[in-house]
Each structure stands twice: as C-alpha cells, then as structure tokens.
A protein has these predicted regions:
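Residue-level detector of conserved, well-ordered beta-strand and adjacent loop positions
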Residues: 8, 45, 56-57, 122, ...
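Short beta-strand segments
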Residues: 51-53, 65, 129
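Short acidic/glycine-enriched loop/turn segments that link adjacent beta-strands
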Residues: 36-40, 61-63, 97, 113-115
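Acidic active-site catalytic centers that drive phospho-/nucleotidyl reactions
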Residues: 13, 73, 123-125
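Helix-adjacent hinge/juxtasegments
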Residues: 55-82
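Vicinal oxygen chelate
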Residues: 69, 78-139
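N-terminal beta-strand motif that seeds the catalytic metal site of vicinal oxygen chelate
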Residues: 1-18, 64-67, 132-139
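Core segments of cupin and vicinal oxygen chelate
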Residues: 2, 8-51, 59, 76, ...
Length: 139
C-alpha cells in the first residue's frame, strides 16, 4: 500500500507562512525542527487529513497551484476562513458537472452534488488552494 505523506510547499518566509497556516487556515503544527541557523523543517497537517504540508524555502518564483482541501460544508468552511482573515474567492460550480466541457458558473451547485462546488484562496507566497465540497470519502 502507498500513501501520500507530505507535499512540499515553497515559501519565502517560513515564520509568516507558519502563522498563516496555523492561525488563519487552522492547520495543526506537527514539526518545527530547527537544529541549526540554516536548517529548519516545518510540517503542518490540515484538520482531518492524513497528508501533511512541509514548508520549504525556495526560489522566489516557485509556486504550487490547485492544492485541494475537501469539506462536507463548503459554505461553513469558507465563512470560517474569512472570519479568520483569509481572502477566499466567491463560490463557483462546475456547469455542466458531468463533462470536462463547459466551465463554471457563479454560486454553489444548487443540488450540492459532490465535487461540483469550489472556492479558492492563496497564501502570502501565492500558492493557491481550492476548497471543494463533497459529502463522503471514497475508501
């Protein structure tokens, strides 16, 4: 069996990113190991996730896009993030949902179907995240 354990996330300032992800987004700090002035490992985990994010200092142009965070209640999660100071975009939904053709329409999917509704935000370094609604977790 294979399991995805960690995704590396490039950041310019580890302390700023650590504050953003723990205080605003609500990630849990798992590791902050800083044995020397030039070596530091910071690992965070989203609530309910088995995959963590490791903050790594990188070239100032390095970015990760479209990291997905799933939730059973997109409206509530978006509101909670906004209340903590995260600039989250408006809701959008796949239209039509059953094909790669087409695009997106404004608002939540009227039927609240799994994998149909989204909202986006980015961290202070420009890494982008997509919140996606789904009511169940496939095994």
């Amino acid at each position: 069996m294979l399991a995805l354990e960690v995704v590396s996330l490039p950041v310019a300032d580890v302390d700023r990113a650590l504050a953003f992800y723990t205080q605003k987004v609500g990630f849990r700090l798992d590791v902050d190991y800083h044995p020397t002035p030039t070596f530091r490992v910071v690992q965070l985990t989203p609530p309910g996730s088995s995959c963590s994010v490791q903050l790594v200092t990188a070239d100032s142009t390095a970015r990760v896009s479209n990291l997905y965070l799933v939730t059973t209640d997109l409206a509530a999660e978006r509101a909670a993030l906004i209340a903590r100071g995260v600039a989250v975009g408006e809701f959008r939904h796949k239209a039509p949902i059953d094909t790669w053709e087409g695009g997106f329409s404004a608002g939540l999917d009227a039927q609240r179907r799994d994998y149909a509704s989204f909202a986006d935000f980015e961290d202070p370094d420009g890494n982008t995240w997509t919140l996606q609604e789904r009511g169940y977790r496939a095994p």
